[in-house]
Structures are given as structure tokens and as C-alpha cells.
Amino acid sequence: MARIAGVNIPDNKHAVISLTYIFGIGRTRSRAICAATGVAETAKIGSLSDDVLDELRGEVAKYTVEGDLRREVSMSIKRLMDLGCNRGIRHRRSLPVRGQRTKTNARTRKGPRKPIRK
């Protein structure tokens, strides 16, 4: 297994699919990375040479991925909560942020039903 950005990449899968194991890299960005390094999308990671893997590592390093991206996302949510704006308040109360209805549904975000105390 090759390690790119601190993630073990499976050897037996195509390069495009394998790169998506890195947090912050989806299919589109994975295709762009393969095109920039000249790696065929259908090439298996296990069959690539160390030089090509180093090129892939360098190309991935240009993007914000893994721990840095997770930190960036959590800090932006924390910033919204500190501001006290509507989105921050919704995050703080564990409610849907983007205008979905909450009279019914939203069970994933709100958690299991709580019984009404009498």
C-alpha cells in the first residue's frame, strides 16, 4: 500500500478511485491530479513506479487535504457559532442549518425522539 498525504492508498484499485480515499479529494479532483501528473486513470497504484508516486504526492500536496482540511472546516463552524449568526445558532442547537423543515423529519440531526414529560 502506498502512502499519500498520510493515508494508505489501496494498490489494487484504479488511480482515480484510490486517490478518493484521501479526505478532500473526490472524483473530479482525482481526475485533475491524474491528468496533471500524466498517470492513466485506469492505472493501478501498485503498478506505478516510486517516481510517479512522488509526482502524485507533490500534486496532492498543492491542495488542502486530510487534517488541515478537517481543522479548517471545524474552525469555520466554530467561527459561525462564536459570531452568533443564524447558521451558528443552528449548529449550536444541532438543528438543520440550510432551511430544512423540522416539524417532521430532521431526525438524523436532532437525534432520537425524546418522550414528553408530564
UniProtKB/Swiss-Prot annotation:
Give a Gene Ontology cellular component term annotated to this protein.
cytosol
Q: Where is this region: Disordered?
A: 91-118
Q: Name one GO biological process term.
A: translation
Pfam families registered for this protein in UniProt: Ribosomal_S13 (PF00416)
Q: What family does this belong to?
A: Belongs to the universal ribosomal protein uS13 family.
Assembly, per entry: Part of the 30S ribosomal subunit. Forms a loose heterodimer with protein S19. Forms two bridges to the 50S subunit in the 70S ribosome.
Q: What is this protein called?
A: Small ribosomal subunit protein uS13
Q: Which gene encodes it?
A: rpsM
